[in-house]
């Protein structure tokens, strides 16, 4: 690209391989620039890029680079590539705004999804002005999420070395949680969604608030009711649930073919009723919301929505036995929900838990390690694994897959030290 026109391509390749981040490599290797310390203001940069025809943008970017120092070039590459990200969750950013402004984080979240960037009305309110006058009837409601049950049962330092038997895990459950306080249901292998319908319109949201309705017109067309339902988006295969791979073929599409609509019909397995008509039910206990949901479905019989059944159990041993069959039943595991819990956005501790099936394991050999990208660019964090098999000349290693996630920062540091040793 641009940098390879200014520096030796092989030098750029080697530098990128060492640094691991494209923006950082370009910002550091670009020759000269920014000598007078007068980088162009952001508004001028945006105006220049907007005004430039597509065929001339490379020249405009190069001219901007020449006026910038390494820090400004780094920011510009990140902005242009859409990669200006930091390791901060949206929830944490909203929590910080709440602490700074004194406004409730729950209200900030609700207004957030009813407004559009750059959120001028929201920031005026946070600075002491009037609350934005916005219709939230069709807006996304921040979802309630669950903690892994292991995170609750074990201290953080114990989790990595946790090799307890199922009986020992049940004993911990019994010591910390009363089964009578919880309802259980299957954790379905789909996509968590929120379906909202009012006189104003209809919307289908992902767990992060993204509007995925255009990919599922069959669902939107069937939402002839008013309210807000929380559930799992699934694809039907006759009377059964199709594998997740079938649902993936319908995700992230702006248009859907008639063939997909016919062969991969979508439906929602409902977990919770957040609004019944205009009535907000989120402050009610889960047991009461669940009863309202069951009655709502029985009365209205909404097309493409069914009820996620409760899993009856009389103790942790019985529930552990059910969980052991989750893989054969094509389930991800179980969900545990306190019967007295209100619906609270975010991930409050102690109210909802997910008890996923145990992962399968395989004995593999680490054969390659590669530097990562971004914040992991200084670590060997991308690993290739192989298994032994019988070859023409005896046993041989055959690569079977790569992994670059699923480990903690401490484990990453340990693996990096092992690779470098």
Give the ranges of each region predicted by the language model.
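Metal-assisted phosphate- and nucleotidyl-transfer catalytic regions
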Residues: 295-344
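Short glycine-rich loop/turn motifs
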Residues: 181, 191-193, 331, 350-352, ...
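C-terminal structured "cap/appendage" subdomains that terminate the fold
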Residues: 418-421
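N-terminal nucleic-acid-engaging modules of covalent nucleotidyltransferase systems
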Residues: 1-273, 277-312, 384-386, 390-399, ...
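Conserved, well-structured core segments
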Residues: 269, 333-336, 368, 382-384
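Short, contiguous acidic/charged loop-to-helix segments that flank catalytic cores in large enzymes
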Residues: 371-376, 400-410
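Short glycine/proline-enriched turns and hinge-like loops at secondary-structure junctions
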Residues: 196-198, 345-348, 376-381
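Flexible, glycine/threonine-enriched loop-and-boundary segments that flank and lead into catalytic domains
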Residues: 147-182, 316-322, 336-373
